[in-house]
Amino acid sequence: MERWSINESAKIYNLPNWGADLFSINKKGNVCVHPSPTSKHSIDLRALVDDLIKRKIKPPILLRFMDVLQGRIASINRVFKNAIDENDYPATYQTFYPIKVNQQRQVVEAIAKFGKRYNIGLEVGSKPELVIGISFATGNGIPIICNGYKDTEYIETVLYATKIGYDITIVVEKMFELEKIIALSKKTGIKPKLGIRVKLSSKGTGKWATSGGEDAKFGLRMSEIIAAIGLLEQNDLLDRVKLLHFHIGSQITKIDKIKSALIEGTRIYAEMRKLGVGIRYVDIGGGLGVDYDGSKSSYFSSVNYSIEEYANDVIYQIKNICEDAGVECPNIISESGRATAAHYSVLVTNLLNTNTSNAMPDFEETLNGTEKLAPTVKKLVDIYKSIDRYSLREDYHDTVQLIQEAVSLFNLGYLTLNERAMAEWLHGKILRKINGIVEKIKPIPEELQNFQLSLRQTYFANFSLFQSIPDSWAIDQLFPIVPIQRLNQKPDVMASIADITCDSDGEITSFVGENGRTKYLPLHKMRKDEDYFVGFFLIGAYQEILGDMHNLFGDTNAVHVTFNKKTGYKIDTVIHGDATWESLKYVQYKGPEILKHVRDTLEKDVALRKVTIEESSHFLELLDRTLLGYTYLGE
């Protein structure tokens, strides 16, 4: 076996650069998770998954590491505290978690609990999210910011929550919304705590750039701000405006775009203060990105700045503009949901098989006796025997031409099925031989840099891409994917990952690699009777809630894990994934009705002796077991 180290594995998956010091590889070759970047403690992912399977918790399994979530909250607050101290900033910083990032009860509950020491708030954008926010704020004093479109019911709920004593701010997104708020305030006699969202000309970058700029969906234009101030003053509500909000998009990849937005947004704040609006908070929205591919670049799956640089720029730019304008520095709020939640969640699942088969015919004899072979096949044999590093380019080009020729000859009836199969087999042998030579050549000839795609095998994984990582399909988002074991061995397969849905789009063909995006994932050959697991990392933001029910594959099993010094880990919560009957219920089918319909039909067939009682009973038992079982694949 070729010598290989865990450091080499870490390098080819670029783990040190995207892992934020939260993931490593141990001496066994297994991926480990750390509770914080500075912690020496870790959990062996493969050992954890093996233990969960013994507990009858089957893959795919969504692992939520709650200490990592707590650590991310602490990190964001720590870097802002440091930036405030270094810049002698005279006001405060506060984090608000946007519930839309992941609305799962246990997740919001953990964030509310961990964030209490930092006075963390919740941002809501709909009536259901408002109810969630109120439920967590009850008895806890958690502040709430209300964004999004609002109807009468939404606004009235906020007004009465204000009256009862909740710390809740309703953000004006549109002028018609302000008019409705004023009317309902008069009707109820309740004065709300108000925020105003402004539409900046500054825009973000990447997939969410349209969240900012003149054509942004939300926010008031400059002329509308002037009109809003006048309207609020007329209705004795100007003193209720406490917050200014702007947002130029999620996953902002370039720090200069953030600086531009901060400068413009703070200038608007300063001018509004001069007009007599007593704003105390500036909410800079989200946008703090995650380096999914570890490239530290402005590519949309990365960011060209650190969290420390982000915090320093926020504090410096706001202070600088306020001092220049001669106005009081505001308290700062950010809604960094992606940066808070992305790292804490890992999906682990088993690989089922590949698109290659051990039952493939072996044409080794063709390498010896070539007299009876078709000329095209004979030429392929000759190339295979003679190829070396000096003839690589020519032999590669000839091989491509000959395999195309073989297909054409077969279609015209001049090659038999057996001869075409021989040509395919030889094509694969030649490419693998070329690859063995190319791996030792530096630099790789330009014409050969993409030929490895011809060797890429498809590994089928027990999951639904559309359910578990929908952004991979919808917007071509990169997520790190790494085998969680055997990383002390050199990977010997170049693979793509296909899910188990009946959809050709359910395949991942772009991966995080050593030098950025790559078209294949290095994996190991699967061994008979041995499970092989891969982990999908940095999926804690948006993926769970955006997932859909394609082919009726439902929610996966989810396990909440915390670190324990004595036992290594502690399982806090197990949330079982959807059974088949639950998935069917989403689309208005009822398991008992299905069983009754089938049973009634089978009873008629038994009476007519089309089936036996035993066959009928066995089929109903299988159907019942399927309804009660996991939607994903078992043995």
Curated annotation (Swiss-Prot):
GO biological process per UniProt: arginine catabolic process; putrescine biosynthetic process from arginine; spermidine biosynthetic process
Positions annotated to bind substrate: 282-292
E.C. no: 4.1.1.19
Chain positions found as N6-(pyridoxal phosphate)lysine: 100
InterPro entries found in the cross-reference section: Ala_racemase/Decarboxylase_C, Arg_decarb_HB, Arg_decarbox_C, Arg_decrbxlase, De-COase2_CS, De-COase2_N, De-COase2_pyr-phos_BS, Orn/DAP/Arg_de-COase
Main EC class the enzyme belongs to: lyase
Catalytic activity as recorded in UniProt: L-arginine + H(+) = agmatine + CO2
Top-level taxon in the UniProt lineage: Bacteria
Pathway(s) this gene product operates in, as recorded in its UniProt entry: Amine and polyamine biosynthesis; agmatine biosynthesis; agmatine from L-arginine: step 1/1
Keyword NADP in annotation: no
Keywords, alphabetical: Decarboxylase, Lyase, Magnesium, Metal-binding, Polyamine biosynthesis, Pyridoxal phosphate, Spermidine biosynthesis
GO molecular function, one term: arginine decarboxylase activity
Cofactor(s) needed for function: Mg(2+); pyridoxal 5'-phosphate
Alphabetical list of PROSITE patterns matching this protein: ODR_DC_2_1, ODR_DC_2_2
Cited function: Catalyzes the biosynthesis of agmatine from arginine.
Entry's family note: Belongs to the Orn/Lys/Arg decarboxylase class-II family. SpeA subfamily.
Protein name in the entry: Biosynthetic arginine decarboxylase
